[in-house]
């Protein structure tokens, strides 16, 4: 847990600093605040904590709260705060964060990354149920990283994706392959790719391909636009509700992407 002197119930998330009264009082305009990314490690998955935080976020032994980080890609940069937590039982942790006491925290979060080692033969149904309850009422993106074997990951992830592919992504920590047919990365490379294409909201995103000079007319970056359209199509399909219509979240995402692309033409 973030606070070693906290309650003996280690599955609780009540000591998360982002929910403190002092910080909540500072929130005057959420639209100018950095998005908050929360990474939680369950049980033995804490063994991968240092490596994951360094590989994905470039954070090395900087405690449980790292503010004013910048996620930089070739085309944009966005400021965010990183929060790190540990728990013994992710089911209790998710239920706690999904309670009314944590409504303000959930409103500030843009992404939760759950890192855990789980066995599909033991706790799939319970984990499914807790995740389903959590994602139904929240707009935060959830990424589940399994540090268990690749075989168990495959079996479990297929079942999860049928549950709700629109709101959660699943990654095998140990998988470093690249799919030949789709050229899609796996493992930590996939995690970074998901963050690259994450629809950041309520924060300042600085586009990098908007520079112009007085003697040269700005031309659209076709490679960027094509790549963006491909990723947007995949994300939009995941946001569909599986019927003839599409979810409100999918429609909002489509509108946002159309605006972003138009601004780069």
From Swiss-Prot:
Gene3D superfamilies: 3.40.50.11960. One of its GO terms (molecular function) is protein-macromolecule adaptor activity. GO terms for biological process: vesicle-mediated transport. InterPro entries: Irc6. It comes from the Eukaryota. Residues 1-21 are annotated as: Disordered. Keywords: Chromosomal rearrangement. Belongs to the IRC6 family. Involved in gross chromosomal rearrangements (GCRs) and telomere healing. This is Increased recombination centers protein 6.
């Amino acid at each position: 847990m973030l606070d070693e002197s906290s309650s003996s119930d280690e599955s609780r998330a009540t000591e998360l600093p982002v929910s403190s009264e002092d910080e909540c009082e500072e929130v005057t305009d959420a639209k100018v605040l950095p998005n908050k990314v929360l990474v939680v490690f369950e049980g033995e998955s804490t063994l991968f904590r240092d490596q994951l935080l360094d590989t994905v976020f470039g954070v090395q032994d900087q405690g449980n709260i790292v503010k004013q980080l910048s996620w930089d890609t070739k085309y944009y940069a966005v400021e965010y705060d990183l929060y790190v937590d540990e728990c013994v039982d992710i089911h209790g942790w998710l239920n706690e964060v999904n309670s009314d006491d944590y409504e303000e925290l959930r409103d500030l979060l843009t992404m939760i990354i759950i890192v855990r080692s789980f066995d599909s033969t033991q706790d799939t149904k319970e984990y499914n149920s807790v995740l389903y309850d959590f994602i139904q009422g929240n707009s935060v993106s959830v990424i589940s990283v399994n540090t268990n074997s690749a075989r168990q990951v495959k079996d479990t992830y297929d079942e999860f994706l049928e549950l709700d592919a629109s709101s959660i992504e699943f990654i095998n920590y140990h998988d470093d392959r690249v799919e030949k047919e789709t050229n899609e990365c796996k493992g930590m490379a996939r995690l970074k790719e998901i963050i690259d294409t994450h629809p950041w909201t309520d924060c300042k995103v600085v586009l990098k391909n908007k520079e112009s000079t007085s003697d040269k007319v700005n031309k659209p970056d076709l490679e960027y636009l094509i790549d963006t359209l491909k990723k947007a199509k995949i994300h939009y399909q995941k946001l569909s509700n599986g019927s003839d219509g599409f979810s409100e979240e999918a429609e909002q995402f489509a509108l946002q992407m159309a605006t972003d692309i138009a601004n780069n033409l």
